[in-house]
Structures are given as structure tokens and as C-alpha cells.
Amino acid sequence: MGYVLKDCDYAISWVNGELRIIKNATVVIEDGLIAGIGEGAYSRGFENIDCKDHILMPGLVNAHTHTPMSLFRGFFDDAELPLWLSKIWNVEKELNHNIVSAASELSIIEMIMSGTTAFTDQYFYPQATAEVVLKYGLRAALGPPFMDTMRDPKQVENELRNFASEYASSQLIRPIINVHSVYTVGRDTLLRIKELSDELNLPIHIHASETRDEVYEIKSKYSVFPVEYLNALGLMSSNLQLVHLGWVTNWELGIIAKAGAKVIHAPTSNMKLATAGHFPMRELMDMGVIIGIGTDGPASNNSLDMFREMKMAVLLQRHSYWDVGIKAHHVFRAATINGYTILGLRGGCLDRGCVADVVLLDSKNPQLQPLRTDNLLSNIVYSVDGSSVDLVLVNGRLIYEKSRDYYALRERAVRLGKEINEFIGRFLP
């Protein structure tokens, strides 16, 4: 089975590692992969999709989020992080499979409609989220979270083993080891997590150096900073994904680079929660570290729109550095090809053999005008938002077509919102 995406006004993507913009492009998709650009497959009986008045680009990867936390959108929004977390954690003790499923579905609808084709998620009841992922057909990296302050680590390990076994051969679900943080997970559990990562060959995904309080707490307890602590325990490797890093020291950057660990920047959430600090994007890039971008959860962002997040990442870096060293192509790479690298997939590009996760934007959208080859990338990063998305394919399957799905998904989102309000209303003042 395949598609011919025919006569796109523009195709913008990474081809052989270089950013290319191709006018009047035709892209062939076969068996879930990119088969080529401009290569005829019309005789194979593939379905042609007329892409006139559209821009073809790779799907966006949300490299860190908490999908079911649409449950908490607008919940104690203006509280600082410690108070906000205490309110959230109080409600999370009452969660169940059904409410996590409903909240996951609401978020996944939002992601699909705004051009996200894959995401990494850290939350409770990952089975509920996985079921919704498979229903809608996008990709996700998932796994039960280790968080000793709330859950028995032995129980989490059993859940992880079952989850990893169930989805070991899935094309869309990638099991991961989720770890909340070094301040909620004890030393013995972290050592066990390292053993599990080696045994199961699964990546570890963890919040690290997010706040000043976290850094001071770990330094006070162990006489080292969080990244140093993880390194001392043997967790620092190419299988480690570090989220936030707003309060990381210069020498810890060298540890990250040497280990080949991946990092994820979540700018909007960090600003909204007033965690301050600074994500050292330029220094990490100069060291060759792979950087992804994530929205964080819809409770702390409050949007899951990766177009907005790309723009915010550039703006925050420029505000911090007082220059324009971080450019549109840096964050476009982070949200596409780097995101897929973090997932362990060859994607985010139009090379032959890349996974066929692509998005079509409406090139007549006023946000994109005036439109030329020289300003196309700038317009995508700085001007548009997810409302420009007209069509989404994941794994070579058409999972969203605005003309077909838009109103039905909006109505479904409203119904899910009402279901969520029935649950969360019990915890409101």
C-alpha cells in the first residue's frame, strides 16, 4: 500500500542531512516508508493525493509531555511549582484507567490536529494512553513512571516488564523507562533502573535539574549536582534522556556530551512555572548533543502545539543570550529529525527509507503570506500554528484529513471535556 503526494507547492525537510526546500515536489510513500521524492509510482496502483496549495514537511515530535494531564488544564494555573505539584499529586492519587484514557484522547486529538506525529509520554496508566495511541494511529514512547514518593518501585517494575513485553513488536508504541526525578526516586531504585535499562535495552527518560530547589536538595544530600549524581550511579549513557536542565553546571554539560545522552528543552512550561534558570542550548549543540523539544504537559504549558513550542524555544534562547545565534533551522531540526533520533527511529526527513510521518500545511493560510522559498522556514517557525495543518500521515497511513475529520474531532473533544470536568470538579475550590 502506498500514496503519491503529488505536486506539493513546497516540500521542506532534511535530505541527506541537509535542509532542502523543493518546489512542485512529489513524494512517494510505500509500506510505511518514504520511497523517494519525484519518483513515479503511478503504475503501482498507489492512491494519489493532490497536494496543490500545500506545503509538505516532516511530522513534529513532542519529545516530552504528560498526555493525560489535559485533565489539569487551567487547574491552579497561577501557583508556583511546589504548590502546583502538591495540588496535582493530591488529585493523581484518585486516578483510574478510564479518566486517564479520556484525558489522553483529548490530548491526542489536539496533537494530531496540530501536526504532532509522535510523542514521548510520562504518566500513570500508560496502557490507557497506549490504547488511544493505537486507536488514532500516531506514535508514542510510553512506560509506567518510577516515583518512590507515590508508588512501590517493585510494582512499577512488574508493570514495566508487562508493558515492554506487550508492545515489544509494535510499530507505533515504543516502551521506555520513565523516572520522575532524582528527588522523588531513591538511590536503590535508580540503581535498579540502570539494571533494567541494560537488561531490557530500554531508554531512561527523566526530569533533571529543573529547579534551583532540586539542585540544592541533591547537592545537600549527596555533595554533587543532579547530572553528576546520575553519572556516579552509572545511569549516564546514550540511553538516557534528560528533560529541562535549566539549572545545570558547565562541567555537567561535558558529562552529558561524553556519555552521548539526549536532552529535551521545554521552554513554555519552564517559563509558566517560573522555574527560571537557563537551558544551555548553544553549548549543548556545540558539543554535539542531540536536543529535542517538548511542550511538557497540557497542565503546565497549556498547549500541545509544537509549532508554538519551536518559536518559543528560539525566543527564549535569544532573550537569554542577547543575540540571534539560535535560529529557525536549529529548532526545526530539534522538533523533527532529532525527535525521531531520540525515539530510536529514522524519521523527520524525506530520505528513502525514513518512516513516512509527514504533515501537509495549507499554503494559502494568511499566516504564511507572503510565501517564498527564502522565507518558508521562517514562516513555519515564527508565524504559523497548528491550525494550518490539513493532513497528517503516520507510518504511511492517513490519520487526519481536516476536510473529513475536523468537525467530528472537535465534537469528540467537547464530549471528553465534559467527562473530565465531572471528575476534576470534585477537587476544585
Give the positions of each predicted feature:
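C-terminal cap of metal-dependent C-N hydrolases
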Residues: 355-410
